[in-house]
Amino acid sequence: MKLTKLLSALLVIGLVLGGCKSKKDSNDIVAPIATLYNEGIILLDKKKYKKAAEEFGKIFYQHPGNEMTPQAELMQAYSLFLAAQYEEAVDILNMFINLHPANIDIAYAYYLKALSYYMLISDVNHDQSRTFLSKDSFEDVITKFPNTKYAIDSSLKIDLVNDHLAGKEMMIGRFYLKKKNPMAAINRFEEVIDNYQTTYHSVEALYRLVESYMMLGLHDEAKKYTSVLGYNYPNSKWYSYAYRLVKNYQN
């Protein structure tokens, strides 16, 4: 009787272990690289981006030394980008850049990384660390690959990023003015003038400097910035506001 129970127990253990082994074996099957790649492309065409990324990702682990593997890594990153999984895309692209610095598509990898950071930019009410990462990454593209189409688009994107960063400084500066803290406000508006002068925020920043210096009683400084406004933006509403503000004090 005891022997029968022992044999039954061993049989159950054997079945369990056998089932686990079968399950493990099915997961460890190495599929042909062409099969995985084609399946990824099919899923990509069907807009099943996350599943496509999974298929392309299998190639890296199952065929790490294959000549198609770098292309599969890029396709995985691209699929993650389309799936709006931008941080995951950046991780794959960083790995690609480190492993394949001389790859024919290295410029695209840098560009897609910058674009992924760009998509992570939050509104001006939140932390802008990713905005700076985006700007730095686009600058990398321009520096490393100046004669590519990616450099041209990166330059345009930097203009948009700068506008965003200037908007953040303006928002903080206005807040300080509202709180009657013109010295802190001046630091923010001067940041816009010094580093983001090509953005459309610069004209308002000049006016806010006039406003801030008038609040401090430094009227000569206010007049100076009014003159700068008049010279550079004579038809701007901000120049009209500054001119009236200074003139009303004189009267």
UniProtKB/Swiss-Prot annotation:
Coiled-coil positions: none
Pfam families from the UniProt entry: YfiO
Lipidation (N-palmitoyl cysteine): C20
Membrane topology, as annotated: Lipid-anchor
Stored CDD domains: BamD
Keyword terms, alphabetized: Cell outer membrane, Lipoprotein, Membrane, Palmitate, Repeat, Signal, TPR repeat
Superkingdom assignment: Bacteria
TPR repeat placement: 33-66, 70-103, 166-199
Entry's localization field: Cell outer membrane
UniProt keyword Chloroplast, yes or no: no
Keyword Transport: no
GO biological process terms, semicolon-separated: Gram-negative-bacterium-type cell outer membrane assembly; protein insertion into membrane
A cellular component annotation (GO) from this entry: Bam protein complex
Predominant cellular place of this UniProt entry's protein: membrane
Lipid sites, type S-diacylglycerol cysteine: C20
Matching SUPFAM superfamilies: TPR-like
Position of the signal peptide: 1-19
Family: Belongs to the BamD family.
Subunit structure: Part of the Bam complex.
Function as written in the Swiss-Prot or TrEMBL entry: Part of the outer membrane protein assembly complex, which is involved in assembly and insertion of beta-barrel proteins into the outer membrane.
Protein name: Outer membrane protein assembly factor BamD
Origin species: Rickettsia prowazekii (strain Madrid E)
Gene designation per UniProt: bamD
